[in-house]
Every structure is written in C-alpha cells, then in structure tokens.
Amino acid sequence: MSASAAYPGHGRELPTGYELVPALLCTEPCSFDITAARERLTERGGYEIVLESPGLEVGVYVLVAPEPDHQQPHVDDEVYVVLEGSGILTIEGERIEVHEGTAAFVPAGANHQFTGYEHLTVLVIFSRR
C-alpha cells in the first residue's frame, strides 16, 4: 500500500486511488445511510468511512476480484458484517467462511485478510482505543 492520505484518527494509510469522503460525525444519537457509499464503491472497490464518533468508526468496505485485500493489522478491535457476497476471512491463520449475514470479530493487532471472493461488501465497525 502506498499512502496518499491517512484515515482520520488512526494513522492508518489510505491506498493510492482511494479517496476520503466526509463522514458523518456523531457525538449524540444519530442515524446514517450507507447506500451512497455502497453505490460509489460497487465497481471499483475500496473503503469509505460513513460514521465517526469519539469511540467508534463505521465504514463500508467493498472488495472486487481480482484485486487482493491489502489489509494490515489495525490498532483497534473491529467487527465485519457481510452485507453482500461470500468469501474466506483468515484471522491469524484460522479460516472462516463468510457470506451475507455473517459477522466476525478481529482483535486489535491480528493479521487478517479476505480471499476467495468475487464481489464482497462488508460493514466495518472499529472501536477507538
């Protein structure tokens, strides 16, 4: 991954070709729509933050074959909820089959990667330490 920008608050690098779209910042109860993010990412793939709060980040992650998943371990715990598609999520060597409706927890610092997908859309929920 080469860096063209950094994700807010985490020091994570944004791959070249990805763009930051302003996310909704919530400090009180709020609702948010992920439809626009899903539509923007459907063809090209990528990650877009849709909600930020002091303790949480929510994003939409779309993987389109043959582009590989370039993730590196993160400093925060995260949960993936598969919205569309199927594949394999490998966490620290353990392979988990994922499909629409599957959720998976990845602890901070864990090596993890999606493989075996054609088109995979995932809701990503990061804690902020």
Where are these predicted regions, by residue range?
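A short, N-terminal "cap"/entry segment at the start of jelly-roll beta-barrel domains
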Residues: 1-60, 70
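Structural motif
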Residues: 53, 91-93
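Short beta-strand/loop turn elements enriched in aromatics
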Residues: 54-55, 65-76, 128
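Short, conserved beta-strand element in jelly-roll/cupin
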Residues: 63-64, 74-89
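A generic "binding-loop/recognition-motif" signal
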Residues: 66, 75, 94, 110, ...
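A cytosolic small-molecule/anion-sensing beta-strand core signal
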Residues: 83-84, 99-100, 118
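Short acidic-glycine-tyrosine-enriched beta hairpin
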Residues: 93-108
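Ligand-binding loop in jelly-roll beta-barrel domains
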Residues: 108-129
